[in-house]
Amino acid sequence: MLSNLLKSIFGSRNDRLIKQYLKIVRTINELEAAISPLSDEELRAKTSEFKQRVANGEKLDQLLPEAFAVVREAGKRVLGMRHFDVQLIGGMVLHEGKIAEMRTGEGKTLMATLPTYLNALSGKGVHIVTVNDYLAKRDAEWMGQIYRFLGLTVGVVLSQMPHEEKQAAYAADITYGTNNEYGFDYLRDNMVGHSAERVQRVLNFAIVDEVDSILIDEARTPLIISGMAEGDTEIYKRIDTLIPGLTRQEDEKSPGDYSVDEKTQQVLLSEEGFEHAEKLLSEAGLLSAGSSLYDPMNVSLIHHLNAALRARALYNRDQHYVVQNGEVIIVDEFTGRLMPGRRWSEGLHQAVEAKENVPIQKENQTLASITFQNYFRMYEKLAGMTGTADTEAFEFQQIYGLETVVIPTHRPMTREDRMDQVFRTPQEKYQAIIADIKDCYERKQPVLVGTTSIENNELLAALLTKEKLPHQVLNAKQHAREADIIAQAGQPKMVTIATNMAGRGTDIVLGGNPEQEINRIRADETLDEAAKSKKIEEIHQAWQARHDEVIKLGGLHIIGTERHESRRIDNQLRGRAGRQGDPGSSRFYLSLEDPLLRIFSSDRVANIMTRLKMPEGEAIEHPWVTRAIENAQRKVEARNFDIRKQLLEYDDVANDQRKVIYQQRNELLDAEQGVSETISAIRESVVHQLIDRYIPEQSIEEQWDIPGLEKALASEFHLQIPLQKWLEEDSELHEENLHDRIIELVDTSYLNKVEQVGAPIMHQYERMIMLHSIDTHWREHLAALDHLRQGIHLRGYAQQNPKQEYKREAFELFTSMLDAIKADVTKILMTVQIRSEQQVESVAETSALRNLEYHHDTHSELAEEQPPVAENRENKQQPFVRKNEKVGRNDPCPCGSGKKYKQCHGKLN
């Protein structure tokens, strides 16, 4: 109450920020009179002037009014589009590293040109992040006209792009690309064998379009690069045939072998289920007589059994995936698009393939991984824009340190958002939806119907066909026609049924979009200019008539067939109507059997319906119901936030270790004088550790195991050292000088090898072996971390803190990995016999990674929503190195041990 009173007196923080920005807007508007008379050359010359001023030490903030005025003028000349004052405000918000919430149709794409141009003047590069390749390419071509006119270079990063083109795109002043591609390029840059193969520069400034989709919806799904693992795929088919023999528990009291938890997307075997499963596995010859599923050697069987149960109980065809050309293709739950080449991990995809009786592909091994949360936090400055961020403002602030600023609309919003109608059954709900669509169709009002799955999408399409109502269907199966369908969704009498993919990034223009028709006329070589102008004018007049007609009818009508888990996604659907002050309306139709209500709120709403004595077939439309639904959504949003926060806390451990490994790797790649000094330090450390194993510190000679040490030196380093003879001949030989003599002999042996082979060849080989060893052990370490994380929650039963235990054990694993790398490198270099340079090149070829797959995967114990996916691409890995976060020798080690870097993981240097 007090906060509301203070707001009414002083205004909210958002209001105060807008007032501050408006002062700068006035300055920009005053500059327009001086900028407008400039010639094109003079306007372009402003870029060189600004760059020089930045080089001389002037801050970007000081340049902002002039730079924005120049971009506004360029927009007028090149695109015929002048930035509104609200777009100038949005540009300032983005430049300050905040999130700009701007309503649909208010011009976010044009707004982004302002801070992009300003920050590109520093010469460090700006990354514009979009949700798909189509938008990246479209915006680079469209808005790129402004940047090129002003003398800046523009690049676009696409998924199948050749290596050289990708390097050129990242070298440009401004780069467009998708969130996935930026992340995968970063990982690939840290897997290359030569520094020249990297593609990314320093991560300077990123503007994330649809920031809620990328930083919230996809935050639970890490980017993973993997390769094929060995293994027999036949087991998936054999296990799948056993699943129908297990019965599902309908509730806690009823008998059954397994239960399904829809909230956490998990399948749990009961004790009876374990016994029944063991019997079925024994009969199938998969479990040896007398052994149990609990035996260590049968852990993989539990893994396969769980994957098969999840595939049968939780994953449905045409909802979570489709089957095309003998392949299981995942459907993106956020966009409704098909994701060819992507795969669920942990054997789930193979289990679904077995269920659908299509060819089964092998499982994958993780080679590199990072979450969007940790990738985007590496940028020196991060900003975002979307139409719906305010509901997630707390999370943006907590996780990314990003403040959300709501930008005022250019024109007042006139869309009418009607109250939800709730029915008892889906049948009643769909009858009401059909009646609403029919009413709009008869009045010629365009309708966009939003569905949450392909299954519901096609069900509604079938009902409309039965009613003989013409309509367009937009889902993952028709994604090729997406632009055409969305472009015409605002036509009179047009009925469009769409999944979540409903054209984010594409405006629905009332009366239809005439641009396609106009472009066709312009490309027609049989018409002269006069004829083209006449036809284009006729098209404009026809569009204006349709536009006016649709406005009179009330604009675009939005129908939601069920509520999403997040209020934000509902708002995105509503936001398709009412752009730039246009009229429009929206309504959601729900039933008590919809997933959100069934899982979270059905009892409460059913009680309300009973209390109000609602007859069957009647809808309830009441503030109580709306409140109950919003509470259910808040519950889900809070749960999802906790999951994302928990994922980040666990991933931060791996992230600190990742930084150390990638820094070591990049120092190896960039070392101009070779890595001989590093190799020498590692060799000395390994030899000391080996000697300490047989001659413990502060021990007496009787405790020494000299024969064991002689044998170890022979097997590890191929060195025959007569230690026993030394001791017999020299009574003065003690522990310390024995260490020194052994190390001296090891060094001499190695230097002799370098002389025989030649220093240049040996230095090249040293670098390759170091990189190969780091990469191999890092992959194994990632698998170990994943295995550790899967079972760490069980520590809670032993009164231990799982997160603390995870940090402690992950650190121990990391230390062991570093020791293993050192031992591995030393042993190989001491024992290898190099006869030619071709041998070295063959090692490089063997080390090159091929047939990589690119995943978007959830960690198993956190997989409470859409799980694991992977994308298969055939292009060579290519890639970035972040140098500006280099750890100083006396700084605390990033691994969290509390030691100085030079005394911990810096020893590798």
Curated annotation (Swiss-Prot):
From the UniProt record, give one GO term of the biological process aspect. protein transport by the Sec complex
Query: Binding positions for ATP?
Result: 87, 105-109, 507
Q: Which PROSITE patterns match?
A: SECA, SECA_MOTOR_DEAD
Molecular-function annotations in GO: ATP binding; metal ion binding; protein-exporting ATPase activity
Membrane protein topology class: Peripheral membrane protein
Q: Hey, what's the signal peptide range on this chain?
A: none
Top EC class per UniProt?
A: translocase
UniProt keyword DNA-binding present: no
Q: What is its EC number?
A: 7.4.2.8
Keywords tagged on the record: ATP-binding, Cell inner membrane, Cell membrane, Cytoplasm, Membrane, Metal-binding, Nucleotide-binding, Protein transport, Translocase, Translocation, Transport, Zinc
Which reactions fall under this protein's catalytic activity?
A: ATP + H2O + cellular proteinSide 1 = ADP + phosphate + cellular proteinSide 2
Q: Which residues bind Zn(2+)?
A: 893, 895, 904-905
Biased-composition ranges, Basic residues, are 899-909
Which top-level group of life is the source organism from? Bacteria
**Where exactly are the transmembrane stretches of this chain?**
none
Read off the CDD domains from this record: DEXDc_SecA, SF2_C_secA
Return the GO cellular component terms, semicolon-separated. cell envelope Sec protein transport complex; cytosol; plasma membrane
Q: Which cell locations does it reside in?
A: Cell inner membrane; Cytoplasm
> Quick one: where's region Disordered?
857-909
The similarity comment for this entry is:
Belongs to the SecA family.
Q: Which function does this protein serve?
A: Part of the Sec protein translocase complex. Interacts with the SecYEG preprotein conducting channel. Has a central role in coupling the hydrolysis of ATP to the transfer of proteins into and across the cell membrane, serving both as a receptor for the preprotein-SecB complex and as an ATP-driven molecular motor driving the stepwise translocation of polypeptide chains across the membrane.
Give the record's subunit note: Monomer and homodimer. Part of the essential Sec protein translocation apparatus which comprises SecA, SecYEG and auxiliary proteins SecDF-YajC and YidC.
Query: Known PANTHER family for this protein?
Result: CHLOROPLAST PROTEIN-TRANSPORTING ATPASE (PTHR30612:SF0), SECA INNER MEMBRANE COMPONENT OF SEC PROTEIN SECRETION SYSTEM (PTHR30612)
Q: What is the protein name for this chain?
A: Protein translocase subunit SecA
From which source organism is this entry?
A: Nitrosomonas europaea (strain ATCC 19718 / CIP 103999 / KCTC 2705 / NBRC 14298)
The gene behind this protein is: secA
